[in-house]
Amino acid sequence: MTVQMEYEKDVKVAALDGKKIAVIGYGSQGHAHAQNLRDSGRDVIIGVRPGKSFDKAKEDGFDTYTVAEATKLADVIMILAPDEIQQELYEAEIAPSLEAGNAVGFAHGFNIHFEFIKVPADVDVFMCAPKGPGHLVRRTYEEGFGVPALYAVYXDATGNAKNIXMDWCKGVGAARVGLLETTYKEETEEDLFGEQAVLCGGLTALIEAGFEVLTEAGYAPELAYFEVLHEMKLIVDLIYEGGFKKMRQSISNTAEYGDYVSGPRVITEQVKENMKAVLADIQNGKFANDFVNDYKAGRPKLTAYREQAANLEIEKVGAELRKAMPFVGKNDDDAFKIYN
């Protein structure tokens, strides 16, 4: 399947004109979507449960309501609460207030694709999924460009769902740099696979394994940390900027030769088969059900995984080394918090 990048000129209909927009949730993505849309001239209110997010939204100048109140007032409702709480939030506070002709949006297809949330047939369902964290969605918008986004339609009750999704993407700044049309199935499954097999799960497991190999062979933990973790950003930045080609042009011949010779010894066909098994568990819903069931049980598995990860030797070594590198970790930690 070949997809074509679309831009502001391709957003033909100002579908959000005259619409009351409710952003549900005011965390990482919520604050960015809401502020960008407001700055794009849209009529935005916030729906959120009492707490830090509620207070922050009011502080930022938004009319802020309970989730149920905001849903009743709005024509277009974007649900940007964490995936695991969306089902109960939708069933208790959003669904009873929906009306025919409303539009409901998401930034990730998880709950719609796996059918944890079922929206009435007379309501549009769309997606705007920026390919970056909320603080970058906001910052790049303020700088005059944006973060690329995927958009999709799951249900088109009014015949206007695609226009709403594209206009939403334009409003948050994504159409300045590029939009790609997708489906809920494709976005959800690819996004989860990327996170689990490569970007988060695969990467951290690779780094930890490399650290263990070096330290178990007698090398100093501090030096091992620099070799397998600290330098990762330098390499990833080069790949991000110009693909594998730019990275390989920027490293030594020794490193490049070692890349070709040893990379396939680490990432073998068996690793690829393991990746296929990860993808299968995503496609058949096993991962989604395990994740949701763990949340409903009080997160025992997630809590145990977090405790185990916090006690890794590489984390302890890294924490000490970063104290001596004041230029590392200067980002505002608050920008990365997600308030429920």
UniProtKB/Swiss-Prot annotation:
GO terms for cellular component: cytosol
Listed InterPro entries: 6-PGluconate_DH-like_C_sf, KARI, KARI_C, KARI_N, KARI_prok, NAD(P)-bd_dom_sf
Active site: 108
Cofactor binding description: Binds 2 magnesium ions per subunit.
Reactions that this protein is recorded to catalyse: (2R)-2,3-dihydroxy-3-methylbutanoate + NADP(+) = (2S)-2-acetolactate + NADPH + H(+); (2R,3R)-2,3-dihydroxy-3-methylpentanoate + NADP(+) = (S)-2-ethyl-2-hydroxy-3-oxobutanoate + NADPH + H(+)
Residues that bind Mg(2+) 2: 191, 227, 231
Keywords, alphabetical: Amino-acid biosynthesis, Branched-chain amino acid biosynthesis, Magnesium, Metal-binding, NADP, Oxidoreductase
GO MF term list: ketol-acid reductoisomerase activity; magnesium ion binding; NADP binding
Gene3D superfamilies given in the database record: 6.10.240.10, NAD(P)-binding Rossmann-like Domain (3.40.50.720)
Coiled coil ranges: none
Metabolic or biological pathway: Amino-acid biosynthesis; L-isoleucine biosynthesis; L-isoleucine from 2-oxobutanoate: step 2/4; Amino-acid biosynthesis; L-valine biosynthesis; L-valine from pyruvate: step 2/4
Domain annotation KARI N-terminal Rossmann: ranges: 3-182
Cofactor or coenzyme needed: Mg(2+)
Record GO biological process: isoleucine biosynthetic process; L-valine biosynthetic process
Residues that bind NADP(+): 26-29, 49, 53, 83-86, 134
Annotated positions binding Mg(2+) 1: 191, 195
Domain of life where this protein originates: Bacteria
Family indicated by similarity: Belongs to the ketol-acid reductoisomerase family.
Function: Involved in the biosynthesis of branched-chain amino acids (BCAA). Catalyzes an alkyl-migration followed by a ketol-acid reduction of (S)-2-acetolactate (S2AL) to yield (R)-2,3-dihydroxy-isovalerate. In the isomerase reaction, S2AL is rearranged via a Mg-dependent methyl migration to produce 3-hydroxy-3-methyl-2-ketobutyrate (HMKB). In the reductase reaction, this 2-ketoacid undergoes a metal-dependent reduction by NADPH to yield (R)-2,3-dihydroxy-isovalerate.
Identification of the protein by name: Ketol-acid reductoisomerase (NADP(+))
Gene: ilvC
